[in-house]
């Protein structure tokens, strides 16, 4: 397989490049009969799209989605759903100086050695532009999961560069370009980003994502454990270099008396497991975090080599996000939704008739 398809029963195959005519995806396995329109998909695409603030790339893309197939008279038919998003604001001349060189931290070097050819315009297939159709596909998954189980998704940025962002309220997240759950820290974040751009540099970020009202039983041990699939999905997002589930690396310093989530008739007393035990969802919130590296495309000159192996200095021009993490929250939600959608269908197919006693306890005792 060439690595362009995600999922087992609910599959998403993406296509296109950053500076091609269009990008898109084909979704297979969506159950029939669900009411669906472009408006159901556009909301999340608008949350992810570029050009929405001075702190992200100024490439102006409307990211307007077109449904080409799989929907008839406003309902899904159970056949493949094709989504198309046309590229409208390519500026390929910005990449003329890197066609024969390799940008440090980018996929240029590895794509060249793997395929023997590469598209240097905006990173081609390796561009984060290709997360747009993924977000579109996940909007369909989110809608189905909400209607079937009441499952909802939310995320926020919890760190920008060196600045930790204390959590205040989810209510703040939709009201700022950073997806920050803290309103008072916004001036500091804006000043930090302005300094980065002025100095021709970039930074990383940490994104937290949560799924609520997740049914118990999702996950396929041993090799398709739910937390393993979530980690796999989040690591597949551009620039992600680390993933935590639940307490994550904090688990190292915890004692067993602290880490193990106690069960009571009223619910779980804590959620260090992040909603997954033995690779199977517990019915608690699924919680995960991901670390995003600094953007590799910066205006500061860096050492590299050209295709002939000669030493050179590389400066990257063009319109780039000084922190790709600023627009990553909807993408993290999307990948989590695709995992849960796929596993919901897999669980329903094999274990949909299973009933045990006692019934599941509440997600939380608090």
Curated annotation (Swiss-Prot):
Residue numbers binding NADP(+): 48, 54
GO molecular function: chorismate synthase activity; FMN binding
Coiled coil: none
E.C. no: 4.2.3.5
Binding positions (FMN): 125-127, 238-239, 278, 293-297, 319
Reaction catalysis annotation: 5-O-(1-carboxyvinyl)-3-phosphoshikimate = chorismate + phosphate
PROSITE patterns: CHORISMATE_SYNTHASE_1 (PS00787), CHORISMATE_SYNTHASE_2 (PS00788), CHORISMATE_SYNTHASE_3 (PS00789)
Annotated Gene Ontology cellular component terms: cytosol
SS bonds (residue pairs): none
Top-level division of the source organism's lineage: Bacteria
Gene3D superfamilies according to UniProt: Chorismate synthase AroC (3.60.150.10)
Homology family: Belongs to the chorismate synthase family.
Quaternary assembly: Homotetramer.
HAMAP family recorded: Chorismate_synth
Protein name per UniProt: Chorismate synthase
Organism: Herminiimonas arsenicoxydans
Taxonomic lineage of the native organism: Bacteria, Pseudomonadati, Pseudomonadota, Betaproteobacteria, Burkholderiales
Gene of this entry: aroC
């Amino acid at each position: 397989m060439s690595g362009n398809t995600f999922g087992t029963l609910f599959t998403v195959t993406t296509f296109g490049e950053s500076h091609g005519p269009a990008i898109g995806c084909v979704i297979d396995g969506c159950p029939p009969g669900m009411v669906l329109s472009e408006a159901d998909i556009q909301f999340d695409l608008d949350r992810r799209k570029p050009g929405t603030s001075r702190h992200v790339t100024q490439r102006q893309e409307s990211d307007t989605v077109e449904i080409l197939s799989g929907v008839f008279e406003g309902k899904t038919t159970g056949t493949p759903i094709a989504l198309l998003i046309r590229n409208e604001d390519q500026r390929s001349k910005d990449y003329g100086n890197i066609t024969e060189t390799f940008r440090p931290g980018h996929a240029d070097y590895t794509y060249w050695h793997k395929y023997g050819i590469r598209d240097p315009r905006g990173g081609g297939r390796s561009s984060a532009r290709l997360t747009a159709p993924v977000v579109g596909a996940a909007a369909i998954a989110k809608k189905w999961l909400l209607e079937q189980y009441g499952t909802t998704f939310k995320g926020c940025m919890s760190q920008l560069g060196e600045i930790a962002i204390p959590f205040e309220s989810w209510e703040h997240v939709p009201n700022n370009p950073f997806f920050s759950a803290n309103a008072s820290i916004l001036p500091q974040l804006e000043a930090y980003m302005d300094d980065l751009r002025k100095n021709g540099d970039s930074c990383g970020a940490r994104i937290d994502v949560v799924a609520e009202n997740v049914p118990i039983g999702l996950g396929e041990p041993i090799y398709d454990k739910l937390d393993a699939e979530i980690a796999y999905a989040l690591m597949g997002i551009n620039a992600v270099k680390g993933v935590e589930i639940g307490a994550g690396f904090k688990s190292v310093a915890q004692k067993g008396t602290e880490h193990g989530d106690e069960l009571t008739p009223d619910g779980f007393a804590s959620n260090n497991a992040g909603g997954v035990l033995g690779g199977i969802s517990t019915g608690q919130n699924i919680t995960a975090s991901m670390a995003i590296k600094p953007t590799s495309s910066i205006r500061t000159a860096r050492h590299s080599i050209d295709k002939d192996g000669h030493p050179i200095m590389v400066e990257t021009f063009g319109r780039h996000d000084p922190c790709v993490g600023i627009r990553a929250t909807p993408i993290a939600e999307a990948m989590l939704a695709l995992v849960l959608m796929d596993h919901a269908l897999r669980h329903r197919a094999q274990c949909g008739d299973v009933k045990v006693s006692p019934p599941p306890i509440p997600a939380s005792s608090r």
